[in-house]
């Protein structure tokens, strides 16, 4: 792999930006595709469609069933799965087709994202538009994407053995990796359009940056917490708010032994943790926004801080509504999409503060 050494002379700044702008736009397009992938993946999970395709065929699997024989063969393979035997016994072929298409489009979109990243990457390399540091970053993102494909199948395999549900650990890893890939592409794209200027000596700004970094990490932790909520269907329990069936701290928090299992396997504890992180963000983000008003910031940085506050309010509203209405498909999918938009806002705030 060959990278070009980019000049750092001031007079070449405009020329460098002209080269980097198309790369940034391409990465933003890839971010949009990953966003769509997260939403489709959420719907696939919510409709219990993820176990409908029992084989991993990265190339051959691109072609959908084209004949009745193809459908019969796929349906017969599905008959051998724990999900069919324990959950969907007696399912008709037409019903199977519904869950099949969700999983098929989820996998197909993954292949599209891989090509949408790899082909332009090769093009920019051949055009010598990518210097060595950028090339290493993009190569790392591509490797993460390849790892994500394997992680997806590793997750599906966990539901094809005895338990007709995928492992919540593998599901959370799959979700977290999707957010990490998105974050890497989004950050690199922002760097290309608006490179950092170095940290300001302003102590208030440094404190605000540290605050925003903590918030970004907390949002990501909340996403992982949401993965466990989805993985063990904890959203179907305690469909009350603000209390959990009359308790702020429910008595079933530490039912399981050893105690640490409760954080991953106990529906009560998993939902409580997710609520607790949301409450924490509901307190900290408004404080952060108020602090940002007292620090001299650019217009784009102020906009980013305000969008973070707005997106948190939207996401909390979606989360509460999803809970109270017992996880309806549309709201639950919107809640998953909202998590990525909230994470995007947090990343943008962090990047903007590094440019002040």
UniProtKB/Swiss-Prot annotation:
It is an enzyme of class 1 (oxidoreductase). It is found in: Cell membrane. It comes from the Bacteria. It is a multi-pass membrane protein. The keyword Cell membrane applies. Its cofactor is heme b. The keyword Iron-sulfur does not apply. Pfam families: COX15-CtaA. Its EC number is 1.17.99.9. GO terms for cellular component: plasma membrane. GO terms for biological process: heme A biosynthetic process. Interacts with CtaB. Belongs to the COX15/CtaA family. Type 2 subfamily. This is Heme A synthase. It comes from Nitrosospira multiformis (strain ATCC 25196 / NCIMB 11849 / C 71). The lineage of its organism: Bacteria, Pseudomonadati, Pseudomonadota, Betaproteobacteria, Nitrosomonadales. The gene is ctaA.
């Amino acid at each position: 792999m060959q990278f070009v050494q980019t000049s750092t002379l001031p007079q070449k700044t405009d020329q460098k930006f002209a080269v980097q702008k198309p790369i940034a736009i391409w990465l933003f397009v890839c971010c949009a595709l990953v966003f769509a992938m997260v939403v489709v993946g959420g719907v696939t999970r919510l409709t219990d469609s993820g176990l409908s395709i029992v084989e991993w065929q990265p190339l051959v699997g691109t072609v959908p069933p084209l004949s009745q024989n193809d459908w019969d063969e796929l349906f017969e393979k599905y008959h051998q799965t724990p999900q069919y035997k324990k959950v969907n016994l007696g399912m008709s072929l037409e019903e199977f087709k519904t869950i099949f298409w969700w999983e098929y489009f989820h996998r197909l979109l993954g292949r599209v994202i891989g090509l949408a990243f790899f082909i332009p990457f090769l093009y920019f390399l051949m055009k010598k538009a990518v210097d060595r540091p950028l090339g290493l970053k993009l190569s790392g993102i591509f490797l993460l994407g390849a790892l994500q494909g394997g992680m997806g199948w590793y997750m599906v395999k966990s539901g094809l053995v005895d338990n007709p549900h995928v492992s919540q650990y593998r599901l959370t890893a799959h979700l977290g990796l999707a957010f990490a890939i998105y974050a890497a592409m989004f950050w690199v794209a922002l760097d290309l359009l608006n490179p950092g200027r170095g940290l300001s000596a302003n102590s208030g700004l440094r404190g605000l940056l540290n605050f925003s970094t903590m918030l970004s990490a907390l949002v990501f932790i909340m996403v992982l917490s949401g993965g466990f909520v989805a993985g063990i269907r904890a959203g179907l329990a305690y469909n009350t708010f603000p209390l959990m069936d009359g308790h702020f701290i429910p008595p079933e928090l530490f039912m399981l032994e050893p105690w640490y299992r409760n954080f991953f396997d106990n529906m009560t504890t998993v939902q409580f943790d997710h609520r607790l992180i949301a409450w924490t963000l509901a307190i900290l983000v408004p404080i952060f926004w108020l602090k940002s008003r007292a620090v001299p910031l650019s217009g784009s940085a102020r906009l980013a801080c305000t969008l973070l506050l707005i997106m948190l309010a939207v996401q909390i509203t979606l989360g509460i509504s999803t809970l109270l209405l017992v996880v309806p498909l549309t709201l639950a999918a919107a809640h998953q999409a909202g998590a990525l938009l909230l994470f995007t806002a947090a990343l943008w705030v962090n990047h903007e503060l590094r440019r002040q």
